[in-house]
Amino acid sequence: MRGAVLRLGAARGQLRLEQEHLLEDIAHVRQRLDDEARQRQEAEAAARALARFAQEAEAARVELQKKAQALQEECGYLRRHHQEEAQAEARDALKCDVTSALREIRAQLEGHAVQSTLQQEEWFRVRLDRLSEAAKVNTDAM
């Protein structure tokens, strides 16, 4: 009987030891679960930020396309208008130097086109820099 009591005591000690190990394993698994949940939330936040970035970039692209189309239409209008004016001036004043007038008008049109293009490029660079900073912040946050 004494041997049975000793065996039961040893078994009890072994069970307590196993229980402690199981509690440690449970705590470790919970910590891993918490870490993975946090990482998943961070990844989801980064994915949302990238989706917003993509939407903003697409909106900027569409806006720039609209501006480019408007500039092309304006350029076509200016060309037509210029041609009409040049023809009227040629009829009114044959002595006028048509070549120099056309060069001057063309230079003005090119100057306006270059200025407009530069303004668009600057706007796009600023917007792209802002979006890149936001993406970098989100990437750093991950």
UniProtKB/Swiss-Prot annotation:
Q: Which compartments does it reside in?
A: Cytoplasm, Cytoskeleton; Cell projection, Axon
The IF rod domain covers which part of the protein? Answer: 1-142
Gene3D superfamilies noted in UniProt: Single helix bin, Vasodilator-stimulated phosphoprotein
Superkingdom of origin organism: Eukaryota
Keyword set, alphabetical order: Cell projection, Coiled coil, Cytoplasm, Cytoskeleton, Intermediate filament, Phosphoprotein
What are the TM regions of this chain, as residue ranges?
A: none
Q: Which residues form a coiled coil?
A: 26-74
PROSITE patterns the record matches: IF_ROD_2
The known PTMs are summarized as: There are a number of repeats of the tripeptide K-S-P, NFH is phosphorylated on a number of the serines in this motif. It is thought that phosphorylation of NFH results in the formation of interfilament cross bridges that are important in the maintenance of axonal caliber. Phosphorylation seems to play a major role in the functioning of the larger neurofilament polypeptides (NF-M and NF-H), the levels of phosphorylation being altered developmentally and coincidentally with a change in the neurofilament function.
Specify whether Phosphoprotein is a keyword of the entry. yes
Q: Which Pfam families match?
A: Filament
The Gene Ontology CC terms held by the record are: axon; neurofilament
Identify its protein family: Belongs to the intermediate filament family.
Q: How does it assemble?
A: Forms heterodimers with NEFL; which can further hetero-oligomerize (in vitro). Forms heterodimers with INA (in vitro).
Function, as annotated:
Neurofilaments usually contain three intermediate filament proteins: NEFL, NEFM, and NEFH which are involved in the maintenance of neuronal caliber. NEFH has an important function in mature axons that is not subserved by the two smaller NF proteins. May additionally cooperate with the neuronal intermediate filament proteins PRPH and INA to form neuronal filamentous networks.
Task: Specify the protein name.
Answer: Neurofilament heavy polypeptide
| Species of provenance | Sus scrofa
